[in-house]
Amino acid sequence: MLPGTFFEVLKNEGVVAIATQGEDGPHLVNTWNSYLKVLDGNRIVVPVGGMHKTEANVARDERVLMTLGSRKVAGRNGPGTGFLIRGSAAFRTDGPEFEAIARFKWARAALVITVVSAEQTL
C-alpha cells in the first residue's frame, strides 16, 4: 500500500507530525523519519517515549493523521516531497511491534499505525 517514494523519504531525516483528536480539539506530537519502521507493508511502528496525551486520545478514537517529508527526495513538482497518512492507531507494550523498536532503549511502548490511505502531498 505504501509507495516506493514513501520509503525513500524514510531514508532521509525529517520531522514527522502525528495528529489525534482530543476532548479539547486536535493534538499533535512530533518524531523523526528515522524512528519509523514499516511492517507488513501497511503498519508503521513508532517508538514512544512520552506521548501520554496521544495514548489517551487513541484510547477514545483510534483515527490518526501523520505527515512526513524530505527536501532530498524528488517530488511531483521539483525537489522535496511529503505524505499524508490516514490510519488507525494502537499502543503496544509487548509483542512483535514492540520488539521492532527494541533498539530504542528509551521506548516505553510502540505506536502502531495501520495505514488506511497514503497520499503524496508534494
Swiss-Prot record:
Chief place of localization: cytoplasm
Subcellular location: Cytoplasm
Cofactors demanded by this protein: FMN
Gene3D superfamilies according to UniProt: Electron Transport, Fmn-binding Protein, Chain A
Assigned keywords, A-Z: Cytoplasm, Electron transport, Flavoprotein, FMN, Transport
Pfam family, one: PNPOx_N
CC annotations in GO: cytoplasm
Disulfide bonds: none
Database matches in InterPro entries: Pyridox_Oxase_N, Split_barrel_FMN-bd
Summary of subunit composition and partner proteins: Monomer and homodimer.
Its biological purpose: Functions as a redox protein with a potential of -325 mV.
Protein name: FMN-binding protein
